[in-house]
Amino acid sequence: METTLRGVGVSHGVAIGEVRHMGTAVLEPPAKQIPAEDAEREQGRARKAVEAVAADLMARGNLAGGEAQAVLEAQAMMAQDPELLADVERRITVGSTAERAVYDAFAAYRALLAGAGEYLAGRVADLDDVRNRIVARLLGVPMPGVPDSDEPYVLIARDLAPADTALLDPTLVLGFVTEEGGPTSHSAILARALGVPAVVALPGAGEIPEGTVVAVDGSTGEIFVNPAEEKKARLAAEAAERKAALAAATGPGATSDGHKVPLLANIGGPADVPAAVEAGAEGVGLFRTEFLFLDDSANAPSEEKQITAYRQVLEAFPEGRVVVRVLDAGADKPLDFLTPGDEPNPALGVRGLRTLLDHPDVLRTQLTALAKAAEGLPVYLEVMAPMVADRADAKAFADACREAGLRAKFGAMVEIPSAALRARSVLQEVEFLSLGTNDLAQYTFAADRQVGAVSRLQDPWQPALLDLVALSAEAAKAEGKSCGVCGEAAADPLLACVLTGLGVTSLSMGAASLPYVRATLAKFTLAQCERAAAAARAADSAEEARTAAQAVLSGE
């Protein structure tokens, strides 16, 4: 009998196949005592296991590249946290085995994270994955993770750790479903980068029996369990039709009446450039630079290293536009040499531009490296600061850019409601705005992007969020400046039309989403997009906003 479940669709496409479940977590090691003379040996075992797991995570990151690399390197740093390792060794000194000491030390750290506010609580899944890998290595048992299979399947898991998502084989994993996570969680972002259909925040998904045939619609968030043959045929036909439409949609982004909407790519480093170029990106709307800093959390990368990496990306887009976000450290991206380790709530503390203004030498080096990397290249370089709260922040960043001799446009990311509410004031100091809708939603609704329980409030269709987008776009238009969106909202083809109708001047997303957005925009006029935007803003919920916009664009 066919049943329908609904979660949150986070990566486009349809997948039909049999269910396979993620490998179970490592069992809790027994709490047996060791003789005092064995303590040194056990400490050595623990250190070797930690080093091996950290090296494995780094290797997976190097293989995956791009955004996945940054996430996995952050996990490797978590495994090697000095305070955590000291706690492991202390527990061994008082009689614990290496595996039990790791298990208990991570449990204590887990409790700290879980109680440190929702932002850091979202890191718990990553921490659990690191713990399981270290304990599995010490016990000599298989690592938890993606099941082995020679046949394609739909993967179901409570949540997917970055180390697993990054190396999913799209030829075998047709799609995946998780019980936890949200539209801007690591799993969702990496799924879009892979082009794998995915649905998250579906409680009870783990109860679907192994081997059951399901159809996953990553656009609507629907899961059809034991779908009828007619349903499978219809979904497959719709998927084939969409694929043909995508192949036919080429060229610059524009509405059907010729209103230009540049479609840009979000990238996490040079490794993401080929996919962006292949997908027809007109440039880069968000170049995350954290990957350069995660290699060594104790020291900033040299100016020379930064110049090399930046130039690789700039050279790939001759006559194109490349928007670079300066280092966004703090909160879920802590760096030993920059971020304080004892902040009670890092998400609301010193992060983003605040961190850089406290360490002007780091900002100066990065801006100087960008200036030198762009020398002699026919590229339109733009540089923006994360976590700009007001005009004073914008002025401090613009002044730093000028002092570094940077010949580029200076911009501000709108991730804090205050920046949207006072966008016209901010624009007195900078030349463009870029809306980071992931964090803007998080701070608007007090809803952590990694916590599945509040994913409803992370939905970029929330009318309050659309109001803030409209405020920013209207301010930019009044000042004769640009206002783009580089958050995951831009990757939703229908929402991309609404954002265009709100006055957004460019859209930036993962490369895999570019064809979907290009094809959808080309179906509608600017006037239709504007009517859809007005209908969405008049709604009272995210679901109503989507339905209202869809009704306008479908002519209902």
Swiss-Prot record:
One Pfam entry name: PEP-utilizers_C
Disulfide bond residue pairs: none
Residues given in the record as Mg(2+) binding sites: 415, 439
Record-level Gene Ontology MF annotations: kinase activity; metal ion binding; phosphoenolpyruvate-protein phosphotransferase activity
Subcellular location: Cytoplasm
Top-tier EC class: transferase
Keywords annotated in UniProt: Cytoplasm, Kinase, Magnesium, Metal-binding, Phosphotransferase system, Sugar transport, Transferase, Transport
GO BP of this protein: N-acetylglucosamine transport; phosphoenolpyruvate-dependent sugar phosphotransferase system
InterPro entries, sorted: PEP-util_enz_mobile_dom (IPR008279), PEP-utilizing_PTS_enzyme (IPR050499), PEP_util_AS (IPR018274), PEP_util_C (IPR000121), PEP_util_CS (IPR023151), Phosphohistidine_dom_sf (IPR036637), PTS_EI (IPR024692), PTS_EI-like (IPR006318)
Active-site residue list: 186 (tele-phosphohistidine intermediate), 486 (proton donor)
Catalysed reaction equations from the record: L-histidyl-[protein] + phosphoenolpyruvate = N(pros)-phospho-L-histidyl-[protein] + pyruvate
Gene Ontology cellular-component annotations: cytoplasm
UniProt main location, coarse: cytoplasm
Family: Belongs to the PEP-utilizing enzyme family.
Entry function: General (non sugar-specific) component of the phosphoenolpyruvate-dependent sugar phosphotransferase system (sugar PTS). This major carbohydrate active-transport system catalyzes the phosphorylation of incoming sugar substrates concomitantly with their translocation across the cell membrane. Enzyme I transfers the phosphoryl group from phosphoenolpyruvate (PEP) to the phosphoryl carrier protein (HPr).
Domain comment, as recorded: The N-terminal domain contains the HPr binding site, the central domain the pyrophosphate/phosphate carrier histidine, and the C-terminal domain the pyruvate binding site.
Note: The reaction takes place in three steps, mediated by a phosphocarrier histidine residue located on the surface of the central domain. The two first partial reactions are catalyzed at an active site located on the N-terminal domain, and the third partial reaction is catalyzed at an active site located on the C-terminal domain. For catalytic turnover, the central domain swivels from the concave surface of the N-terminal domain to that of the C-terminal domain.
Quaternary assembly: Homodimer.
Name of this chain's protein: Phosphoenolpyruvate-protein phosphotransferase
Lineage: Bacteria, Bacillati, Actinomycetota, Actinomycetes, Kitasatosporales
